[in-house]
């Protein structure tokens, strides 16, 4: 049927139902939800949890936890991770409730802010522009390399003493391990980050948390701005 829309008409679009991957197993565990609407979900991920299954950690991932949340609440959406975090990074993760919403978000700038605990006393603020590439001898490790992809991070120091700094970091690009690689590059690896030279006697997971997300909603066209506290990192800073 061909019909020309008229002022005042209401148009309803029903997205097709998606079927989750058969490899995903629902992981029933309480989910820390900080924002939800018909299209998006923002949750707070703990440390020691993958966003998605991997060979080393095939189950109990965040996406499987969200899948269980769908089942428990009779929701038929299929979650898609939009902003992924490393296994040991904590904080905010944005998920889309449909592949089409995920696609729309891929064309929207998402501002992300992190809090990092690093070795040594950092400068009051800084800009790190250094290309990042995969290390030749590893499929996991990244490094600053002239052959890498452009990467830019900016930071400001919130608190600092001789052996440790608490920094607010803003990503301007989204390379794998970007903050971890950039802070190693400037001589201030993240505390607890053994992969990038930040070993610590008491802390064995890197101290990094995504504390803020801001973007324009792909459907509602309003600004979504979510911020969480970082009390744990402040406690660690005071302890060190």
Predicted regions and their residues:
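RNA pseudouridine synthases
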Residues: 1-240
